[in-house]
Design a protein with these regions (language model features):
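Structural recognition of an alpha-helix C-terminal capping motif at a helix-to-coil junction
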Residues: 36, 50-57, 70-82
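DNA-recognition helix of helix-turn-helix
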Residues: 74, 81, 85, 137, ...
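Helix-turn-helix DNA-binding module
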Residues: 46, 128-139, 143-164
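C-terminal edge and immediately downstream basic/flexible tail or linker adjoining helix-turn-helix-like DNA-binding
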Residues: 2-4, 14, 96-103, 127-128, ...
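Arg/Lys-rich amphipathic alpha helix in sigma70-family domain 2
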Residues: 64-68, 78-99, 111, 119, ...
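Sigma70-family region 2
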Residues: 16-17, 40-43, 54-71, 90-92
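Internal acidic/polar
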Residues: 4-5, 86, 94-119, 150, ...
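Short, charged helix-capping/linker segments at alpha-helix termini
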Residues: 2, 14-25, 35-54, 162, ...
Length: 194
């Protein structure tokens, strides 16, 4: 058994035994990456923070099921992805509020001379394009291209084959390219008409 696997099993055992210091260690080691994942999947800081708390509450309840077959971080990612996808499905009917606060940002230049609204619109375009991806493709894309996980790890996190992960990342990139290219073309047409 590798040292990191032994450390994962020992940390999980300490958490199960009620060692608050161990759970704090677990939280500090993984909270930032899990928050980042939740934020990128949800596009909303408040929702990501709420979900992060739910993820760690769930982890605390489910640590009994951790057997050490995968790294503790991978197990947490899988738990997080399941909760995130459940949350996304439950709110599928609600529209995201991507434009809050943009009305006042339009005329403020940043240090590079770009308008803040232009950067916000770029971010909104990306968020909208990501939101149009199927859940599996979006999750695989974010885990691979944003979080830096390997396809094998993504397979473990999402419960899919390594080849499926590769396929979903590829499909996500193609669809994002198509959606963002379409958005640029639409903006260009609108600006030509002014």
């Amino acid at each position: 058994m590798s040292t990191s696997k032994e450390a994962d099993l020992a940390l999980a055992a300490r958490c199960r035994d009620g060692d608050l210091g161990a759970f704090e260690e677990l939280y500090k080691a993984h909270a930032a990456r899990l928050y980042s994942l939740a934020f990128r999947m949800l596009g909303n800081a408040a929702d990501a923070e709420d979900l992060l708390q739910e993820i760690f509450l769930s982890a605390h309840r489910k640590l009994e099921s951790f057997r050490g077959e995968a790294a503790l971080g991978t197990w947490l990612y899988r738990l997080a992805m399941n909760q995130i996808l459940d949350y996304v499905r439950s709110r599928a009917g609600r529209a995201g509020q991507l434009t809050d606060g943009l009305e006042d940002a339009g005329t403020l230049p940043d240090a590079g001379g770009h308008r803040l609204a232009d950067r916000a619109i770029d971010r909104i375009d990306l968020e909208r394009a990501l939101a149009e991806l199927p859940d599996g493709c979006r999750a695989a894309f974010l885990l691979h291209d944003v979080e830096g996980l390997e396809h094998k790890e993504i397979g473990q996190v999402l419960g899919i084959a390594e080849g499926t992960s590769k396929s979903q990342v590829h499909k996500a990139r193609l669809k994002l390219r198509r959606l963002l290219t379409r958005n640029v073309a639409e903006l260009s047409e609108r600006s030509d008409g002014l």
